[in-house]
Each structure stands twice: as structure tokens, then as C-alpha cells.
């Protein structure tokens, strides 16, 4: 009896009708019949109870609401509820309440669907690639979304997250389930669940500010087996992809000529990808990235020298990589013999994906011995000098494979220091970049920005928006150069330049227009200058979970009404914060050919036009603000401190927006830091002192006061 009373005192209060638990400012209230869940934070309601029941069991298409039958405490001291339905379905729920997170681990008495349901909330954001699949309009607000078979492979959906954040209400919600899920965020309900739980399933609700929510989400991802891994610096520079420049049929000569032309024209390339065509060409059984270590002798007669050529120019060299093995390929027999592929009825299952064209076996990612075998095979590529891989498994939708089908492999490669451009993932981030699905000239151009922002909301903010201009060699569209195509190339390059990474493809020189060449080169050079700043934000994401590289305005400014309702194909207000100082405002969308201006929302504070230095007091909307091709789509605000490259140096650029701003910059090694603090009384007479007592020289350039910074040193500007 005394143990029970102590448990009640520490963990909550039981009354005839309710169960209440509290930690910090977070309170969970559960009503018994039917079980209804309500959550408050700091005295304000965040997630409301659904009147028809908050926990449902049984048939996934006709689940039943459950009620609380009894309460107890587990061996770990956690509150445990026994619940049941009117038809006799039952389950146990283990509850954990902390200051910013509530976990519900549900264990049904038999395999069945388990759903958690709250009252409707809006607007909501997230859902990864699913945010742009099967919806009537492109919009980051997922209100109205309902999918009772939420799984990768539905259309272009490969980067998968069912994390949904409601910034106005100050909560986020998900079920941790790599298999088929139920996800609804409608005018009637906020519901998530698993269609079939074999043993147990976890639901998490995060509460607080967006920074608090994303930090808790990060900690849980790392704790529950969905790790966020540390990205690497080179991938945040300007790159080049053979698929964009040369399509599938690559060879040593044309790749070398194309990359060397870009370098000669002043493009600051830091990485490159040859995604296909390097394998032996004669036999179809070799036509896949799993020809490990075997190059076509005519197309790539000296792969080691070929790769070394690019290393000598400072580029990281990557190849395409999939976990699909052509059934009669060079390594498939060993995989079958050792039971390393996905099986059916005790035999390796033969499948047919979108690529390769031949029947394949698929590596069983759930077996550690299969992952180790695959990584050992990858070393056959690494031995030639390959630095990493563009992961691009696709076309598997009809097989119902788990969303996490590539995570273990990519994690193992990342732990070896390989560069990974990720395309498939579930909640985890075992990659340096999160690639938006193939994005081409012939497609609706609102998909790209909505897709990128949706990924950022969902915990995937290391956005690579695919190849600038897309893939001209696939035959998807007429290659005739038109004024529309020229405008597209300029707009696409400028939009890409303010993401974590940008990759060149079709040569700017092929359009026969000096303006196109000038604008595309300027976009690449802008991205190159910002590479250290972008990477610093990526490391902050890795450490804190918050999407510092691409923070949508509803996340960065959740209490400002003007931040909402803009990221859609009607308003086309595609804006986001980069770090604590830059606001990206690219003019993009399906009206790119005719649009020359946008309504730009500036959140609270002082903002400066990056190009002109003109100052604006906000919050305000700049109606029909001119953004012609070539205008840098950036404003500076917040801390007012931006780190850029200047030749071989890194410089802190201080803009006149906040005399008391401060920031911490993380260097390209991902470890060293510098803090910069402003204490400005007179902008016309600035002095920079280092903490070691030294004085740094600075000068006004391009609307900002610049001075060189060095790793490990801290600075004050006054």
C-alpha cells in the first residue's frame, strides 16, 4: 500500500474519471471511458482530447476505441494502463512523461492495429516526401491529409517521416513504425498508428517551442535507433552530376572534359557524381552498381587514374550505389547461398524494380551479416579511390518493403567515413545530404520548393534540391533552347544556391546566352562563399535537432501570423531562415517564366537587402518586391553575423541590424568554434578585439564590416 501511495505521489493522481501525470510544465490527462488523451504545457492546452476516443485497437479499417480497465506500475516504476474494447480487444500502455515529451508504448494482446487519436489541430507540417504525393495542391500545410497505407514507394516518396509539427499549438506527434502506417491530419482528427503491431509500438508527443521540440526529437531518434549522423564539409559545396550533364552513357573522356570545362569557367566544384554507366557494358547481368570493382574496360580504361585526376583538383568523387543485385550478377550466388537477400517461403525473393531492368534480389537490411557483406563489397569500389555514394534505390512500391530499407547500410558506410547522398530513409539521417526526388524542366516547379520545405519540417533539413536544370539526356522533354528554358535555368540555379548543396549538370555554355552563363555562375559562386556558413548550421542541426540549415518561417517565427499560409502554389512565398542571420527569398514556382516579383514577408526585427544594403523595419510585407534573374535572394537580420569565404580566408561579415547580436560559428572540421559577440555603440567606428587580447583589422565591404577569423578564437565587435 505504501509503495502504491508513493507511486501516486511521484507519477500522478488517480480519480474516478481521470489519470493525471506531470513533469515540469507538461501535464498529461487521461479520461477513462473511452480513453481520451489531453496534454497541456505551461498551463495552456496543446494537444486536445478526441471526444470519440484516443486509443483504438483491432481491424485497421474498423478499429475500436478502448477504455482504461486498470492501472499499475511496471518494474521500472512507470505507470502502466490496461485497456480494453467492448469486443474484448486488450492492450497494455506504459507511460513516460518528461518536461518536453510523452511516450506511450502500447503492447496489444494479439497482433492488430493500434492507433492514437487527438482532436484536430491546424496548421500542421511535415510528412517528408508524402507531403507532395496525392494531394490536390502543393502546400506545406498538411491539413486535410489522410493516408491509411502510409509507406515508402507511393509515387516519389522515398525520404519518409511521419513526424508532424503543429507550431501554433506547440506540439509534434508521431508513431515510430517503419512498416505500413495510418496518418491523418484532418478537420476531424490528428491520428497516427500502425496497421499491424506484432509486439509493441511507441507513440511520442513532443511539446514546447520548436527548438525544444526538435531537440527532444533528435534525442529520441538517436535513442530509439534512428540516428542523426554527422555530415561532412565537402558535400556542402558546389558539385557536378554526370546524370545531369551526360545522362546514363558516361565514359572517362566525356566526364573529364565536362568537369574540366566547368572548372575552367570558374565553377568552384568540390564534389562530383558518376551515377551510372561505369559498369561493364557488354553483359546485361553487369548493368548495376553492384558490379563491385568491375568497370567497363572501353568506357573506363583506367579508373584509378581517372579518379585521381579529380582528386588532384580538390574534388570528392562519388558513384551511384544501390542494394539491388541482378539475379545472375557476379556476386548474387554468394548472397543466395548465405541467405543475405530478402526471402519468401525460405528462398531469395526475385523482384523487379524500376531499375535495373533485369530481375533482382534485394539485400536484407535487417540482417547484420548482410550489411557487413555489402560493405565489404563496397570496398572494391573504395580501392579505386571512390569517396562515397549517391544512394538511389527506387521503383519498389509494389513490394511493401519497410521504410528503413537503406538506413542500416547507409549508417555503416557513414561510420567508415564515406560520403553519402541519401534518397531513402525513415526518420534516421545516415547521410550527409537529403536529396529531393528527381526534379526536371517538364515538371510542376512548385513541387521542388514544397518538397524541400516539407523535408526540413520533418527532420531532414540537409537539402540537396537535385541537379540544377534536371536531366536533359533522359528524353523527358524537348531539348530545343527557348527563352522559357533559359529563364528556368537561371531561376533554378538561384533557388538551388541557397540550399545546403547544389549540383551542376547541363552546361550553361550550351544555352548560347551570356546572361544565363553569368547568372548561373554567380549562383554557384554565392553558394561557394556561403559553404562554411551552411556547414556550420548543418553541425548545429546534428547537435541540436533544429533545422538550422532550412528553418521554415512557421518554425522560426511560430507566433507571427504572417509566417503562415505562404508556402504553397498560390502565394509561392517560399522563404526560410539559414542559421540565425540569413533569410532566403528565392523567386520560384511554376510561374517562373513570367514572374519578376514576389510578396516577401519579413519577420519581426531589422532586415537588410543582401545586395543593396537597404534597411527594413519589420514585421512587414514587401509587396511585389522585384527579384529579377541575377538578384541575390537573401536578406540579413537576426544576429546580423554571416561567415563567408574570401579567398583562402574565412571572414565574419557584420551587417547593421543588431548592435547586440551574437553567434557561434563551427569550422569546416566540424569541431573548432569561434564565438562572435557584438557590443556596438557607433557603427561608423568599429573595433574588433580577440579574447587573447589582440586586435583584428576590419573593413566595410559589400554592405558589411568584414574581418578574418581563425579556429578557436573568440571575438567582440564594439
What do the PLM-derived regions correspond to, one by one?
Residues 60-104:
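Extended, loop-rich substrate-binding clefts of extracytoplasmic carbohydrate-active enzymes
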Residues 24, 28, 97-624, 628:
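Catalytic-domain carbohydrate-binding cleft regions of carbohydrate-active enzymes
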Residues 114-117, 591-604, 665-684, 703, ...:
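Surface-exposed beta-strand/loop patches in extracellular or lumenal glycoproteins
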Residues 11-14:
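N-terminal signal peptide c-region/cleavage motif recognized by signal peptidases
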Residues 17-51, 88-92, 97-101, 601:
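Beta-strand-rich N-terminal accessory domains
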Residues 25, 37, 102-109, 582-586, ...:
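Short, well-ordered beta-strand segments enriched in hydrophobic/aromatic residues
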Residues 631-694:
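Accessory, solvent-exposed terminal regions and/or long lumenal/extracellular loops of proteins
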Residues 1-7:
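Sec-dependent signal peptide recognition
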Amino acid at each position: 500500500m505504501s509503495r502504491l501511495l508513493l507511486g501516486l505521489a511521484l507519477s500522478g493522481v488517480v480519480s474516478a474519471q481521470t489519470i493525471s501525470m506531470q513533469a515540469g510544465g507538461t501535464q498529461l490527462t487521461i479520461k477513462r471511458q473511452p480513453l481520451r488523451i489531453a496534454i497541456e504545457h505551461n498551463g495552456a492546452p496543446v494537444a486536445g482530447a478526441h471526444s470519440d476516443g484516443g486509443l483504438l485497437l483491432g481491424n485497421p479499417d474498423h478499429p475500436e476505441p478502448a477504455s482504461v480497465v486498470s492501472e499499475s506500475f511496471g518494474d521500472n516504476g512507470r505507470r502502466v494502463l490496461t485497456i480494453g474494447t467492448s469486443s474484448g480487444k486488450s492492450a497494455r500502455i506504459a507511460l513516460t512523461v518528461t518536461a518536453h515529451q510523452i511516450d506511450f508504448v502500447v503492447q496489444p494482446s494479439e497482433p492488430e492495429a493500434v492507433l492514437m487519436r487527438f482532436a484536430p489541430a491546424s496548421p500542421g507540417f511535415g510528412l517528408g516526401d508524402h507531403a507532395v504525393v496525392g494531394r490536390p495542391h502543393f502546400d506545406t500545410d498538411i491539413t486535410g491529409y489522410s493516408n491509411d497505407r502510409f509507406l515508402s514507394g507511393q509515387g516519389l516518396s522515398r525520404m519518409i517521416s511521419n513526424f508532424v509539427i503543429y507550431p501554433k499549438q506547440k506540439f509534434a506527434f508521431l508513431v515510430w513504425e517503419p512498416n505500413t502506417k495510418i496518418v491523418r491530419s484532418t478537420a476531424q482528427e490528428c491520428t497516427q498508428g500502425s496497421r499491424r503491431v506484432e509486439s509493441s509500438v511507441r507513440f511520442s508527443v513532443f511539446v514546447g517551442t520548436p527548438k525544444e521540440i526538435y531537440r527532444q526529437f533528435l534525442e529520441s531518434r538517436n535513442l530509439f535507433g534512428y540516428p542523426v549522423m554527422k555530415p561532412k564539409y565537402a558535400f556542402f559545396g558546389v558539385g557536378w552530376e554526370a546524370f545531369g550533364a551526360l545522362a546514363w552513357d558516361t565514359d572517362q573522356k566525356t566526364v573529364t572534359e565536362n568537369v574540366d570545362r566547368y572548372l575552367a569557367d570558374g565553377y568552384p566544384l568540390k564534389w562530383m557524381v558518376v551515377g551510372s554507366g561505369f559498369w561493364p557494358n557488354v553483359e546485361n547481368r553487369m548493368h548495376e552498381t553492384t558490379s563491385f570493382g568491375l568497370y567497363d574496360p572501353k568506357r573506363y580504361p583506367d579508373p584509378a587514374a581517372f579518379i585521381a585526376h579529380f582528386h588532384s583538383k580538390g574534388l570528392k568523387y562519388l558513384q551511384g550505389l544501390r542494394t539491388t543485385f541482378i539475379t545472375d550478377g557476379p556476386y548474387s550466388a554468394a548472397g543466395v547461398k548465405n541467405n543475405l537477400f530478402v526471402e519468401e517461403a525460405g528462398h531469395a525473393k526475385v523482384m523487379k524494380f524500376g531499375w535495373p531492368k533485369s530481375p533482382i534480389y534485394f539485400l536484407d537490411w535487417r540482417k547484420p551479416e548482410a550489411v557487413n557483406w555489402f560493405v565489404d563489397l563496397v570496398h572494391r569500389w573504395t580501392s579505386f579511390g571512390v569517396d562515397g555514394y549517391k544512394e538511389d534505390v527506387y521503383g519498389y512500391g509494389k513490394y511493401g518493403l519497410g521504410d528503413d530499407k537503406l538506413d542500416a547500410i547507409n549508417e555503416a558506410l557513414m561510420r567508415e567515413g564515406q560520403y553519402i547522398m541519401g534518397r531513402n530513409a525513415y526518420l534516421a539521417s545516415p547521410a550527409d545530404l537529403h536529396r529531393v526526388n528527381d526534379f526536371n524542366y517538364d515538371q510542376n516547379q512548385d513541387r521542388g520548393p514544397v518538397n524541400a520545405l516539407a523535408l526540413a519540417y520533418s527532420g531532414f533539413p540537409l537539402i540537396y534540391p537535385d541537379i540544377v536544370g534536371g536531366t536533359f539526356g533522359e528524353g523527358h522533354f524537348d531539348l530545343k533552347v527557348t527563352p522559357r528554358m533559359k529563364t528556368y535555368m537561371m531561376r533554378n540555379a538561384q533557388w538551388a544556391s541557397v540550399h545546403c548543396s547544389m549540383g551542376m549538370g547541363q552546361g550553361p555554355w550550351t544555352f548560347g546566352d551570356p546572361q544565363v552563363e553569368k547568372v548561373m555562375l554567380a549562383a554557384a559562386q554565392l553558394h561557394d562563399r556561403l559553404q562554411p556558413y551552411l556547414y556550420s548550421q548543418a553541425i548545429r542541426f546534428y547537435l541540436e535537432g533544429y533545422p538550422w540549415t532550412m528553418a521554415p518561417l512557421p518554425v522560426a517565427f511560430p507566433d507571427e501570423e504572417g509566417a503562415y499560409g505562404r508556402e504553397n502554389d498560390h502565394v509561392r512565398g517560399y522563404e526560410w531562415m539559414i542559421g540565425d542571420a540569413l533569410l532566403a527569398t528565392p523567386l520560384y514556382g511554376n510561374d517562373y517564366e513570367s514572374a519578376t516579383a514576389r510578396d516577401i514577408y519579413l519577420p519581426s526585427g531589422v532586415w537588410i537587402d543582401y545586395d543593396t544594403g537597404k534597411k527594413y523595419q519589420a514585421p512587414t510585407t514587401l509587396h511585389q518586391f522585384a527579384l529579377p534573374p541575377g538578384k541575390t535572394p537573401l536578406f540579413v537580420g537576426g544576429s546580423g553575423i554571416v561567415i563567408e569565404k574570401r579567398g583562402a580566408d574565412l571572414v565574419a561579415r557584420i551587417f547593421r541590424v543588431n548592435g547586440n547580436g551574437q553567434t557561434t560559428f563551427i569550422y569546416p572540421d566540424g569541431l573548432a568554434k569561434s564565438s562572435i559577440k557584438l557590443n556596438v555603440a557607433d557603427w561608423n567606428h568599429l573595433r574588433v578585439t580577440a579574447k587573447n587580447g589582440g586586435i583584428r583589422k576590419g573593413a566595410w565591404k559589400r554592405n558589411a564590416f568584414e574581418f578574418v577569423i581563425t579556429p578557436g578564437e573568440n571575438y567582440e565587435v564594439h
